[in-house]
Amino acid sequence: YGFGCAGGNLSPQLSWSGAPDGTNSFALTCFDPDAPTGSGFWHWVAVNIPPSITELSLNASADGMPDGILETRTDFGAPGWGGPCPPEGDHPHRYVFTLHAVGLDALPVEADTSAAVVGFMLNFNTIEKTALMGLYKR
C-alpha cells in the first residue's frame, strides 16, 4: 500500500480480562488521531471477537485471526492491520487501541465496511470500553 516503516508491519500481541456482564463479543480498533488527514487514520478494525477469546497473538492479523473474528476495512483501503508510519519529521503520533465490550454476538458488518460505519455501530452497542495508547515518531 505504500505505507510502512520499521517493525515488519506485525500486529501487536494484546490480551485483556474482566469483561463486564452482558458482553457477547469484543471489538478492537487502532486509530491515529494525529494523522495529517483532517480526520485521523484507522489502522485496525477487528469485530465479532467471541467473548471466550481474551488474547490476540503477535501478527495475528497476517497469520490468521481466531475463528469468528472479522477484520474490516481500514484507511489503508483493505481489512487487516496496517502499522504506524507517520510522516518523517512530524510530531509523535498517538496510536489508540480501544477494546469494546459489545452487547451483540456480531455486529451487522462485512469485511468491506468502513471504519466509520463500524464506529457508528460500536457507538450504539458498546457496553464498556478501555484504551491503550502508544506513541511513534520517525
Residue ranges and their predicted role:
Residues 1-138:
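N-terminus-centered regions that define maturation/targeting leaders and the start
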